[in-house]
């Protein structure tokens, strides 16, 4: 494990080339923990989702540099709870 944990949060629905570039840059800085927003968050944001949480988790886990993908309470529209979860875990 690297010295730094880099937190990336988002819906990633679907993961596209811009996301991949972000992951590649983050990987240069440290190990990546992904805070993956819920299906409900995507419905509130976009009205629907393309890939469900489990499918998005599977894709994210297979990106080089990702050491963990976490579900978190995003009911308030923020990633605050997820960040606190990462701090507690790592």
Predicted segments, located by residue:
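Nucleotidyltransferase catalytic core that binds NTPs
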Residues: 1-90
